[in-house]
Amino acid sequence: MYFVVVATHKEEMRQERARLQDAFAAYIHDLTHHPDVTVHHGGQTLSERDKTVTGFVLVLEAPSIEVAQEFVDGSPYARAGTFAESHVCPWNWLTGRPG
């Protein structure tokens, strides 16, 4: 199943988010942490005003929403409490789908 993750960081956690950026990138690319989850696409969301990072969007493939949520909850950002909010939603991928 495919899922979309939309997460927004707390504004007051900007420095902590920046400090953890490399750890988060390593986490989503290292399959040993999450062998059942594949990250197909991802990127940062930006403020319209000054283009600072406000959060991120990921497209995941996982066997269930519970596994996808565990992946998000195990991330360096989640463990550090940087999220103002995060949502994992099932996604019906229609265009640009691999395979």
Role assignments for model-derived ranges:
Residues 1-99:
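Conserved, structured core segments of small domains
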